[in-house]
Design a protein with these regions (language model features):
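Short runs of predominantly hydrophobic/aromatic residues within well-ordered alpha helices
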Residues: 2, 26-35, 39, 63, ...
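Long amphipathic alpha-helical segments with strong coiled-coil/leucine-zipper propensity
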Residues: 1-34
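Alpha-helical oligomerization segments
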Residues: 44, 48-115
Length: 115
């Protein structure tokens, strides 16, 4: 998941080679990596559960909507202080990650029913 999150964050920031990194603030890169990690984690944790009650096309559509929700929510509400205290070597144990995944799943249940 971490490698996928890094790749997606670099793509989202239009970083195609190492030279591009000098134009991106470290906190911006870390925030993007964290957001992508949470998006991938949500899909990893819940895709199979969602797919049990829905067809593959609907599952993909719902996961795309949740990706957008997670991205918007974290871009608007994730604070630099939250990122500075995180151990990026153990993201799965992070309170920010746990809380974000729990909140996203609650929103999913509210709008789309139990997975």
């Amino acid at each position: 998941l971490s490698a996928e999150a890094i790749r997606a964050a670099l793509k989202g920031l239009n970083i195609t080679d190492l030279g591009d990194l000098k134009d991106v603030a470290p906190d911006v890169l870390l925030k993007e990596m964290l957001i992508e990690y949470i998006k991938f984690s949500f899909a990893f944790r819940y895709e199979e559960k969602i797919r049990m009650k829905r067809n593959p096309e609907e599952t993909e559509r719902l996961l795309e909507k949740m990706d957008k929700y997670i991205s918007n929510e974290l871009h608007n509400n994730l604070k630099l202080e939250d990122i500075k205290t995180m151990d990026f070597g153990h993201l799965q144990a992070s309170e920010v990650v746990k809380r974000s995944l729990e909140d996203a799943y609650k929103v999913f249940e509210l709008f789309y029913g139990e997975a």
